[in-house]
């Protein structure tokens, strides 16, 4: 292991074949209020984090969604960065309703819920709203946030493809809870060209290895959410800690570096509200691992048996008629 840049970690990914993006991006979800609801408590800090990411660290890929806030996250990005640098790629998502704070925690007693909504009319409305909030004429990457089991996927993606033809979307992607399957991706490609997917994936949860291999072979960006796991992966008792200490880096940096080496299709979006942690995460791009070290890190995590936070695919989806 060394801490110099290498082609494996520094070469940009060509999103859609024409948008070069640095593979260590930024996930803006946490720049909202408590429970990802409303504006951030410290707007000045949120602006500082975004500006430092883009102007100081050279991050040129930012991930957001209309459901973060809802809407506040997109507006914060515009407030901090508009007019945007020419090379900045903003990915936003639509097609998910939220009922309140902390509604991603499905097993919390009495918790609010998330609700996929793939109705074409709703998606068109949400694209128009995202364009307005972000202050752009065309969204570089727009992802269907969650697949609606009550609406044919071809109908949802078909409407987004029409918006793409109208010049309002440049590239299309697909996300789901907890992730897009190979079968869903193949089905989606019959309707629209999908250049990115966003799935749960990290060194402790590699259940979607098959999806990652498919994405890599087909030059599709694989954007892993929860790249640092759900706490246990990077905590003081993590299996990564002794390995990271040996090389004078943090467990977070090691976990991110592992992903950068796992596949050239992985496009990372670690999120933070701290400039200090932002710098720490960005430094992971300079950590070089050889193939033996990549295998050893995965083996160490497997032996530790770290628990994964992985909801059963589509198990928590409620029908659209429950929304009020």
Name the predicted role of every residue range.
Residues 1-92, 323-324:
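N-terminal binding-site loop/beta-alpha segment at the start of enzyme catalytic domains
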Residues 3, 12, 147-324:
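Beta/alpha (TIM)-barrel catalytic core signal, keyed to glycine-rich beta->alpha loops juxtaposed to Asp/Glu
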Residues 19-24, 57-60, 84-88, 136-140, ...:
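Short, well-ordered coil/turn segments that N-cap beta-strands
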Residues 31-44, 108-121, 145:
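Active-site mouth loops of central-metabolism enzymes
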Residues 40-53, 116-133, 180-185:
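Short, acidic/polar
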Residues 87-99, 199:
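A short, structured active-site edge motif that brings together acidic residues
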Residues 97, 101-108:
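Short, flexible, mixed-charge acidic loops at enzyme active sites
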Residues 131-149:
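Active-site groove signature of glycoside hydrolases
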């Amino acid at each position: 292991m060394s801490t110099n840049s290498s082609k494996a970690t520094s070469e940009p990914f060509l999103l859609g074949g024409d948008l070069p993006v640095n593979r260590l991006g930024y996930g803006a979800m946490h720049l909202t209020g408590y429970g990802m609801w409303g504006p951030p408590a410290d707007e000045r800090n949120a602006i500082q984090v975004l500006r430092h990411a883009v102007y100081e660290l050279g991050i040129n890929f930012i991930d957001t969604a209309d459901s973060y806030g809802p809407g506040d996250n997109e507006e914060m990005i515009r407030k901090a960065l508009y007019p945007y640098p020419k090379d900045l790629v903003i990915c936003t998502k639509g097609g998910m309703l939220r009922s309140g704070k902390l509604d991603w925690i499905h097993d919390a007693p009495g918790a609010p819920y998330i609700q996929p909504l793939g109705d074409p009319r709703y998606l068109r409305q949400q694209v128009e709203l995202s364009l307005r909030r972000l202050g752009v004429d065309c969204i570089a990457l727009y992802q269907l946030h969650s697949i609606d089991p009550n609406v044919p996927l071809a109908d949802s993606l078909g409407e987004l493809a029409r918006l793409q033809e109208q010049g309002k979307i440049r590239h299309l992607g697909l996300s789901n809870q907890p992730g897009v399957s190979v079968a869903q991706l193949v089905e989606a490609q019959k309707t629209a060209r999908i250049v990115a997917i966003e799935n749960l994936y990290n060194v402790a949860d590699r259940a979607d290895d098959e999806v990652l291999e498919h994405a890599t072979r087909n030059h599709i960006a694989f954007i892993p959410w929860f790249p640092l796991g759900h706490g246990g992966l990077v905590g003081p008792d993590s299996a990564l800690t002794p390995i990271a200490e040996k090389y004078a880096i943090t467990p977070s940096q090691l976990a991110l570096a592992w992903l950068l080496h796992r596949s050239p299709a992985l496009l990372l979006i670690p999120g933070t509200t701290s400039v200090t942690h932002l710098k720490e995460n960005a430094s992971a791009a300079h950590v070089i691992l050889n193939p033996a070290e990549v295998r050893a890190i995965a083996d160490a995590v497997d032996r530790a048996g770290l628990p994964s936070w992985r909801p059963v695919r589509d198990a928590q989806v409620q029908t659209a008629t429950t929304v009020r």
